[in-house]
Amino acid sequence: NKRKNKIEQTIDGQEFCTGDYIPFHFYARMPMLFNIQKGYGVTQVHAEDIVYLIVSIDAIINEPSREYIFSDAHAISKIAKFYGPQHITEIDHLLDIDSIKSFQWSDDYIKKERKQAEFLIKGDIPVDYIEMMCCYSQKVKEKLIGMGAKMRIVVSPKMAYY
């Protein structure tokens, strides 16, 4: 795993290890998901076996003891810059929102890396921070409910999956 022991710095000089943080993306249909669903360079996982967890950033940033960092590109990318909590109010200006929301990225390396900007959260995430789940089919939704999922579950095969 390339990120497990990778040491980085925020633009303000705070050192951290990317492997100590749980990465979340800001939108759907990431290049990594494409590779996982197609089996490019990794073990193939079918869409029915992938569930998105949608986490409340507000809950995280409003918890004083919660450590988080965000990047403006994929965390292992050479072009990524990292920002600490003091920059959270600037997030809309620091991230390339058009690239993040784009579904066309294969012919543009920079767009592909910027699409994969990350919100990195240190430590475990309380289950009540999960606002909803997104899954591929009604069958998967029913399975999640059967497993005890209490949060909102959205079925979104075209928006969220390849």
Segments (PLM) and residue ranges:
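Active-site-proximal loop/hinge segments that shape catalytic or ion-binding/gating pockets
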Residues: 1-162
